[in-house]
Amino acid sequence: MRILYVEDNPELRETIGMLMEGEGRMVTSCACAEEALVLDAGHPFDVLVTDVSLPGMSGTDLARRLLANDPLRWVVLCSGYELGSQPGSWGPNVRALLKPFELEELEQLLGGIHTALASVPT
């Protein structure tokens, strides 16, 4: 499972990025939505995990752009404030994770996504 992780805080980006690695997961991290679009353009990632508040283009705008190309893409929006029911209306595979989150929450979410992706016929 290929994960694109977008986080502007360098310490969080490095730590969370490393913690998401392993168990069939490859993580590519970047600091902004604009870089994420470039990285995703060549070979789309299976999952986008992004902070909502980013410099320049926001994480929500990034998610909308990527979902426009692939409405079934998995997206995890990480935010320090409640997003309400908004993300669920964007597509069936969009989830929100409230910051600060426990690593177990992220792990459980990614495990569920991995299982769902593995069950999709290729």
Protein language model features and the residues they cover:
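Acidic, metal-coordinating helix/loop segments flanking the phosphotransfer/catalytic sites
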Residues: 4, 29-47
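Acidic catalytic/metal-coordinating carboxylates
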Residues: 32, 58-62
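Active-site residues of response regulator receiver
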Residues: 51
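The feature encodes the CheY-like receiver
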Residues: 55
